[in-house]
A protein has these predicted regions:
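Glycine-rich phosphate-binding loop of ATP-dependent small-molecule kinases
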Residues: 1-207
Length: 207
């Protein structure tokens, strides 16, 4: 958002965005970055950057991805730790990680090791029917604009991704609720209203 005022935190915060595919995590994470000056840690972006870096770790990532295998939690945690090493006054927002209970435990251990804590986990809640409509609509808009369409932007792929989400990632809601850090947002409304609510939650987490 050009010309936006950055609302820096009173202290660095670590925030996780949770939600099913198509909930708008990436979009809202970028808004938090613009508003609060935080750093977005997107595992997808980090893996792609590592793959293209030519480093030893990058070559490992490239080999795993070329085989079509899942990148190990060890590699993902290493990438996150490396990204966090530079530090940032306003903190970090995790987008797309953790996705499993094991990853949540690993992230908690990393934060504790570096003298930090998890301040808030914010779940974006969207009905499955709305998610399907969003994904199908996104694909139709891309086609109309002559842009490439993501291979998984269709109803069938989304249903498979949702099944995986509810099996592996949804249990994190109970996990973080038990730790007292879980909050939720109705993410079926206007983007600006969602962003405003999310921004207030992030600001409160820094108190």
């Amino acid at each position: 958002m050009d010309g936006a005022t950055v609302d820096t935190q009173t202290r660095p915060v670590n925030v996780i965005l949770l939600g099913p595919p198509g909930a708008g995590k990436g979009t809202q994470a970028l808004r938090v970055v613009d508003t609060h000056g935080m750093v977005q840690l997107s595992t997808g972006d980090m893996l792609r950057a590592a793959k293209d870096s030519g480093t030893e770790m990058g070559n490992r990532v490239a080999e795993v991805m070329a085989r079509g295998d899942l990148v190990t939690d060890e590699i993902v945690i290493w990438l996150i730790e490396e990204k966090r090493t530079g530090g940032d006054a306003a903190g970090f927002i995790f987008d797309g990680f953790p996705r499993t209970l094991a990853q949540a435990d690993a992230l908690g251990a990393l934060l504790e090791k570096t003298g930090h804590r998890l301040d808030a986990v914010i779940a974006l809640e969207v009905d499955d029917e709305i998610l399907v409509n969003r994904i199908v609509g996104r694909a139709e808009e891309a086609r109309a604009a002559g842009q490439p369409v993501r291979a998984d932007d269709n109803a069938e792929s989304l249903k498979l991704r949702l099944t995986e989400y509810y099996k592996k990632t949804a249990p994190l809601l109970g996990y973080f609720h038990a730790k007292g850090v879980l909050q939720s947002i109705d993410a079926m409304g206007e983007l600006d209203a969602i962003a405003e609510t999310l921004s207030a939650m992030v600001k409160d987490a820094a108190i």
